[in-house]
């Protein structure tokens, strides 16, 4: 809808340039906003205010000229000027009706494919394989996945990259412990069943025994040198750890697969090449024995350029080195147009610096967009980063299990006659969806409080509320005895609540565009919540199955059907499955 209005305004600007009312070199960015007050129309624009100064015109007078030069369209029934020069657009109900009829028949619900699809690389989840996935991995995994699904739905070629931490000094400690177990004749597989216990045991040995710590350091050197025995143990550990990750992804409904894994170790043979390239270009400087790139745009308190360390004094490499190698791979091998990083906000400076080094070195093209998509912290109800009652970092698998158990009790209370298998299935969907939606519905840049009571509520902007809203529409069609997609009559919008619902339904394309461009799934969550609320108001004010006429009944069934389809598609893009009944 916004695109249609934007096109009308663009045509008006062309006319005004020809009339020499607006300077020919003006290329304004046209923003279309939803109005909050329906008396001011459906959409508003501040174009006249933006162009008034360069056009040397009074804003309200310029708004009149813009309106006069907008071509006739079935889209708009009238336009009004408000305040200092805002242009308000009132959408024609007849246009709405045609849009609803079209969306109902369209599998894509009128969501447009990108005119110029891109190859978009998305780096998300990326856990450290030394430990089990914990609550800190939740946000990157599900926010990144929702954006990946949305960009794919828009027709882009999305390449998922799970940049797991499968290399580094901590693996020397783990290998040393694996060697100890093997020497004792203990099966390594049994000990790897619980990665967290295994890691703590290895860390305990490392801290308490200098001999163990020395062996661990030697094993890191052997591993990095390609020692076959070390690599074999390392591969065994990674295989087990990746299997744990994949189980969690499947439970979470995250679309990452083993084929998407490209860990730090996959760039090992490119790290020295990165250093050599930077050196050849004269970008490297020695600082206290380390090789660094100094960036003029990043300075300390004294005004001196900050270093990005590329290679340590002892010859070791850092995250910056592997990130630069990954960027070159993603540019040269994957031909990325955009590279998105869903990583904690605390890594903001790191990415700003690495992006600048990559551009300075020509590792990425000028047109390639490098975007850090930061997110905040999951907090406990005590206002501190979320932990278990014992103070330990909460395992993601344990959180999901607790969510399912709590959801089971809620569902069982409401459906005492339901069979056990169905109860378990519904509880699993409700529990997992609640954890995901509680996160996705928050602006990703903000911290949020993790609360089972809030996320499992059937009131407010929650997964249970939206899942129930969907089942409510399903039950209407069940009572009517017809399939949801079988309504053939045209929509007729005569009541205020019908028009309100229709207006919201045709915004779906705009919302999907917004999520795709900004990487913000909470926009979609807010839209779905508002849509469910408007459907509830429509349902109360406009009887469907007992409508006054058959024509009215069919029209309202179509509105209800499109609402359900939109809820289902929207939730699917968030990685959430719907239920036929709750």
Curated annotation (Swiss-Prot):
Swiss-Prot/TrEMBL GO biological process terms: arginyl-tRNA aminoacylation
Protein name per its UniProtKB record: Arginine--tRNA ligase
Taxonomic superkingdom: Bacteria
Subcellular localization: Cytoplasm
Keywords, comma-separated and alphabetical: Aminoacyl-tRNA synthetase, ATP-binding, Cytoplasm, Ligase, Nucleotide-binding, Protein biosynthesis
PANTHER family found in the cross-reference section: ARGININE--TRNA LIGASE, CYTOPLASMIC, ARGINYL-TRNA SYNTHETASE
Organism: Psychromonas ingrahamii (strain DSM 17664 / CCUG 51855 / 37)
EC assignment: 6.1.1.19
UniProt xrefs under PROSITE patterns: AA_TRNA_LIGASE_I (PS00178)
Chain location of the short sequence motif 'HIGH' region per the record: 127-137
The family this protein is said to belong to: Belongs to the class-I aminoacyl-tRNA synthetase family.
Keyword Transport (UniProt): no
UniProt keyword annotation of ATP-binding present: yes
InterPro entries cross-referenced by the UniProt entry: aa-tRNA-synth_I_CS, Arg-tRNA-ligase, Arg-tRNA-synth_N, Arg-tRNA-synth_N_sf, ArgRS_core, DALR_anticod-bd, Rossmann-like_a/b/a_fold, tRNAsynth_Ia_anticodon-bd
Cross-referenced CDD domains: Anticodon_Ia_Arg, ArgRS_core
Gene Ontology, cellular component aspect: cytoplasm
Oligomeric and partner information: Monomer.
Any one GO molecular function term: ATP binding
């Amino acid at each position: 809808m916004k695109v249609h209005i934007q096109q009308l305004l663009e045509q008006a600007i062309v006319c005004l340039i020809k009339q020499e009312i607006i300077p020919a070199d003006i290329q304004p960015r046209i923003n279309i906003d939803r109005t909050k007050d329906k008396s001011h129309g459906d959409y508003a624009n501040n174009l006249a205010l933006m162009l008034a100064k360069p056009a040397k015109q009074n804003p309200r007078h310029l708004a009149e000229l813009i309106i006069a030069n907008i071509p006739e369209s079935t889209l708009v029934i009238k336009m009004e000027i408000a305040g200092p020069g805002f242009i308000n657009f009132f959408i024609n109900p007849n246009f709405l009706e045609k849009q609803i009829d079209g969306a109902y028949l369209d599998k894509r619900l009128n969501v447009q494919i990108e005119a110029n699809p891109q190859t978009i690389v998305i780096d998300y989840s990326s856990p450290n394989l030394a430990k089990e996935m914990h609550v800190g991995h939740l946000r990157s995994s599900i926010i990144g996945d929702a954006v990946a699904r949305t960009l794919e739905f828009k027709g882009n070629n999305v390449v998922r990259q799970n940049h797991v931490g499968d290399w580094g000094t901590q693996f020397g400690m783990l290998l040393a412990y694996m060697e100890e177990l093997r020497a004792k004749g203990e099966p390594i597989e049994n000990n790897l069943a619980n990665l967290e216990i295994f890691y703590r045991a290895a860390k305990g040995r490392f801290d308490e025994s200098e001999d163990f710590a020395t062996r661990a350091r030697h094993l890191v050197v052997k591993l990095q040198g390609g020692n076959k025995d070390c690599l074999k143990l390392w591969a065994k550990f990674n295989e087990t750890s990746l299997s744990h990750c994949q189980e969690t992804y499947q439970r979470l409904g995250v679309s990452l697969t083993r084929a998407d894994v490209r860990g730090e170790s996959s760039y090992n043979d490119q790290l020295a090449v990165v250093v050599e390239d930077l050196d050849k270009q004269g970008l490297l400087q020695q600082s206290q024995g380390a090789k660094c790139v100094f960036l003029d745009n990043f300075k300390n308190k004294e005004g001196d350029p900050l270093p990005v360390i590329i290679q340590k004094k002892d010859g070791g490499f850092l995250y910056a080195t592997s990130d630069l190698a990954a960027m070159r791979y993603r540019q040269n091998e994957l031909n990325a147009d955009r590279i998105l990083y869903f990583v904690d906000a605390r890594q903001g400076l790191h990415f700003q610096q690495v992006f600048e080094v990559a551009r300075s070195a020509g590792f990425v093209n000028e047109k390639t967009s490098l975007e850090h998509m930061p997110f905040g912290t999951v907090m406990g109800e005590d206002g501190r980063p979320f932990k278990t009652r014992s103070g330990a970092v909460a395992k993601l698998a344990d959180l999901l299990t607790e969510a399912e158990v709590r959801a089971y009790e809620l569902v069982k209370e409401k459906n005492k006659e339901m069979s056990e298998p169905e109860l378990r299935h519904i509880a699993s969907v409700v529990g997992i969806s609640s954890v995901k939606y509680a996160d996705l519905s928050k602006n990703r840049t903000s911290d949020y409080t993790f609360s089972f009571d809030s996320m499992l509520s059937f009131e407010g902007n929650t997964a249970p509320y939206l899942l129930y809203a969907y089942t409510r529409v399903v039950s209407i069609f069940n009572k009517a005895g017809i399939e949801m997609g079988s309504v053939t009559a045209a929509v007729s919008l005569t009541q205020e609540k019908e028009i309100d619902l229709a207006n919201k339904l045709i915004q779906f394309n705009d919302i999907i565009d917004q999520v795709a461009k900004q990487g913000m799934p909470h926009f979609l969550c807010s839209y779905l919540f508002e849509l469910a609320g408007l459907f509830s108001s429509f349902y109360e004010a406009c009887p469907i199955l007992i409508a006054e006429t058959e024509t009215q009944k069919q029209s309202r069934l179509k509105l209800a059907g499109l609402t359900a389809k939109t809820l289902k598609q929207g939730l699917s893009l968030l990685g959430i499955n719907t239920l036929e009944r709750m």
